[in-house]
């Protein structure tokens, strides 16, 4: 099982839109092994394209063994992140078949790859504002908690903490939400903000949107906090060397 398989409890083409979006988000950051028409020459690669009813598609897997297993033998390949491959295929006017015969099998046509490219183009806009913080909406927590936890887990070691809060004064529900990030070095903040903006672009839109804030102030008690601690393996209890000696 791979990271893509873990998200495919329901097959991609049977899943609802949020589940498909989460798989595509993970696909963008997955190192894919894509079949080539011939061995690469320097940095030039020629993707092996297969004719299908809807047009030509490239074939990629998330492990070398899966690609070799599909062909029944070793085949020329190149490794590249899904986001890079999606860009190449958009230029070539081709689709993408991922992990055929596996739990995470997906067939992405040109329209799906175009949507993926649009989501990956999401970028934060820097700004400042004075906000009144409040508890996040239950609906927003239900929609964002799990996928945000997965993405924030990728940032362990780069940030010290994260919390989701609501913002706004009027009404029973927050007008918007803020994802508070603590402990991020200033030089890393643009890259972290871009990664989180991409993640949010793949998730169901929330009323008023979700902003990303870098602050060292402790989140309020009503915030939804994300546990970024690294789990330590519990050492096994020492085994006795032998039965006790009875005297």
Residue ranges and their predicted role:
Residues 1-247:
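An interfacial alpha-helical scaffold signature
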């Amino acid at each position: 099982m791979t990271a893509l398989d873990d998200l495919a409890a329901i097959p991609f083409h049977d899943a609802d839109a949020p589940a498909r979006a989460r798989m595509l988000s993970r696909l963008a950051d997955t190192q894919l092994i894509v079949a080539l028409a011939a061995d690469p020459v320097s940095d030039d690669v020629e993707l092996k394209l297969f004719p299908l009813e809807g047009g030509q598609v490239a074939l990629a897997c998330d492990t070398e063994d899966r690609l070799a297993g599909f062909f029944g033998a070793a085949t020329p390949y190149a490794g590249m992140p899904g986001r890079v491959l999606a860009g190449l295929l958009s230029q070539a006017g081709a689709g993408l078949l991922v992990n055929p015969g596996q739990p995470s099998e997906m067939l992405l046509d040109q329209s799906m790859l175009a949507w993926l490219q649009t989501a990956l183009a999401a970028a934060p806009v820097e700004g400042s504002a004075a906000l009144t913080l409040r508890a996040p909406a239950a609906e927003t927590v239900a929609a964002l908690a799990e996928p945000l936890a997965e993405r924030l887990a990728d940032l362990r070691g780069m940030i010290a903490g994260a919390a989701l809060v609501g913002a706004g004064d009027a009404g029973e529900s927050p007008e918007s939400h803020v994802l508070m990030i603590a402990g991020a070095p200033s030089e890393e903040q643009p890259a972290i903000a871009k990664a989180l903006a991409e993640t949010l672009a793949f998730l169901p839109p929330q009323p008023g949107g979700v902003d990303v804030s870098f602050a060292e102030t402790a989140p309020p008690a009503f915030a939804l906090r994300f546990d970024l601690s690294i789990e330590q393996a519990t050492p096994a209890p020492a085994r006795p060397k032998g039965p006790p000696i009875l005297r």
